[in-house]
Swiss-Prot record:
Any one Pfam family match given in the protein's UniProt record, by short name: GCS2
One record GO biological process: modified amino acid biosynthetic process
HAMAP family hit by this protein: Glu_cys_ligase_2
Segments traversing the membrane: none
NCBIfam families the UniProt entry points to: gshA_cyan_rel (TIGR02050), PRK13516.1 (NF010040)
Catalytic activity: L-cysteine + L-glutamate + ATP = gamma-L-glutamyl-L-cysteine + ADP + phosphate + H(+)
Self-association and partners: Homodimer.
Domain of life: Bacteria
Record's keyword terms, sorted: ATP-binding, Ligase, Nucleotide-binding
UniProt family annotation: Belongs to the glutamate--cysteine ligase type 2 family. YbdK subfamily.
Molecular function as annotated in GO: ATP binding; glutamate-cysteine ligase activity
Top class in the EC scheme: ligase
Name of the protein: Putative glutamate--cysteine ligase 2
Length: 371
């Protein structure tokens, strides 16, 4: 399938997608009933959508095009409430978090969708192991060249995005020692990590054509890069975050990304080049392993700073752009989070250390999501 032309979007408009866990009380294992919920709820929604993801324990909710984070919050809240009502009718519960702490990937049923069936043909058991839960944020751009500049600019902050939403320390009933273990599930994918270097949209067209020769890539949806352009929507899509435990956190990270995008495209502070990505895997790993306590290394100077420090140093620079976008509350929340030692991943560990069970942890997450 040829690459679509880049659809011109209003700059800095937003779209948010959240992959949620569908669980069965009282044991709180993953359910295989996403289709039941979707059939119940899809005709009740007046904004956004609820749809399948790759397995039947995953429910994706998504906004439409939003002007600002307040608009996005209104849409997501309405969808959340409709899904909660449907879940109660079917004796199910919903929660956030980047991974379920004790599910068996072998029992996950692939959703009845031709694209997902093809994914299984390509990736085998890796597709079932991808029963993990992420947040994606789309930011509108006016052109393909703007989208490529923004993609490279936001790639500098991938560790920050991972660390702020890190909520998947438990996997396969084991403390992984990672703040975000979710991204490790994709490490065997041939397109894991950053997009290959291209400088402009013309170069991206060539790249997509070359990738299509593999017979694995029919559309942009078949690419699993950390950040990817979405020409059909006219956006850049950031894909590295765990789904957080609360809707508020999902809004805060979206506002932070939107504010960064506004700064990057307005001031053009960087001259992007391929060497920018030399230490990308190492800095990304630090965020996955240690969250906000991870250490970032500057690719040119060798200077090292914690992710917390970088976020706090960015805040003053971003403040006027947050004000412009009506995202000041989101930026302030991110700053508070960077100053706090109580990450979502650590709170999960503390719950278990204080005598809680893994099923009790999922129950708690369901209560948090429903609150």
């Amino acid at each position: 399938m040829p690459l679509a032309d880049f659809h011109r979007s209003d700059p800095f408009t937003l779209g948010i997608e959240l992959e949620l866990q569908v669980v069965n009380p009282p044991g709180y294992d993953l359910s295989q009933d996403a289709s039941t919920l979707i059939a119940d709820v899809q005709h009740q929604l007046t904004v956004g959508e609820a749809k399948h993801d790759i397995t039947e324990s995953m429910l994706e909710i998504a906004t439409g095009v939003c002007r600002d984070i307040s608009h996005a919050q209104t849409q997501l809240s309405a969808i959340q409430q409709a899904v909660q009502r449907a879940a109660l009718r079917h004796h199910l519960q919903i929660c956030g978090g980047g991974s379920h702490p004790f599910h068996a990937w072998q029992r996950q049923q692939i959703s009845d969708n031709p694209r997902y069936v093809k994914t299984v043909e390509h990736f085998g058991y890796l597709a079932q192991q991808a029963t993990v839960f992420g947040q994606h944020v789309h930011v509108g751009c006016q052109s393909g060249d703007d989208a490529l500049y923004l993609l490279h600019g936001l790639s500098r902050f991938v560790p920050h995005f991972i660390a702020l939403n890190a909520a998947s320390p438990w996997f396969d009933s084991t403390d992984s020692r990672f703040a975000c273990s979710r991204l490790n599930r994709f490490s065997s994918y041939p397109d894991n990590g950053p997009m290959p270097w291209v400088a402009d949209w013309q170069g991206f067209r060539r790249l997509f054509r070359q990738l299509s020769y593999t017979s694995m890539i029919d559309s942009m949806k078949d690419l699993h890069w950390d950040i990817r352009p979405s020409p059909q929507f006219g956006t850049v899509e950031v894909r590295v975050m765990d789904t957080p435990l609360t809707l508020a956190q999902a809004i805060h990270i979206a506002g932070f990304i939107q504010t960064l995008a506004c700064w990057l495209l307005t001031e053009r502070p960087f001259k992007h080049q391929p060497d920018d990505y030399l230490l990308y895997p190492f800095n990304r790993y630090q965020a996955c392993r240690y969250g906000l306590d991870g250490t970032l290394t500057d690719v040119r100077s060798g200077e090292q700073r914690s992710i917390r420090q970088e976020i706090l140093q960015l805040a003053d620079r971003l403040a006027p752009f947050a004000h412009q976008l009506k995202a000041t509350a989101a930026l302030e929340a991110v700053v508070r989070q960077a100053k706090s030692p109580h990450s979502e991943a650590q709170q999960m560990r503390d719950f278990i250390a204080n005598g809680g069970s893994l099923s009790g942890l999922v129950q708690k997450h369901c209560e948090i999501w429903a609150a």
